[in-house]
Amino acid sequence: MFDCSGYVLRIYKQFGVNLDRSTSGMFSQGESVAKKDLQVGDLVFFKTTAAKVGHVGIYIGNGKFVHSSTSQGVIVTNLNDPYYWGKRYVGSKRVAS
């Protein structure tokens, strides 16, 4: 089972894209993308602690993203979930074209 950044790293590596191992490192890579301009494959980031970006997933279209947690495995979630992820969204990056 992967944590969030390990899952993203593995997926992108299959397509020949090299990413940093950490979520915060991934957040410093690529081109920033506005939420309204998200495309399939863009990375979406969330602030899970008061201090830093702590979670990453891959946008899959229709307002949803796929991500991994050590407790639930790989799951698909609504990006605009009003109870958790929607409130914690901090930005998106395009690292592959």
List each language-model region with its residue ranges.
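Short hydrophobic/aromatic patches on the structural cores and recognition surfaces of FHA
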Residues: 7, 57, 92
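Short, cationic motifs built from Arg/Lys/His that form the positively charged side of catalytic pockets
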Residues: 20-23, 55, 94
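Catalytic cysteine-centered active-site loop
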Residues: 1-40
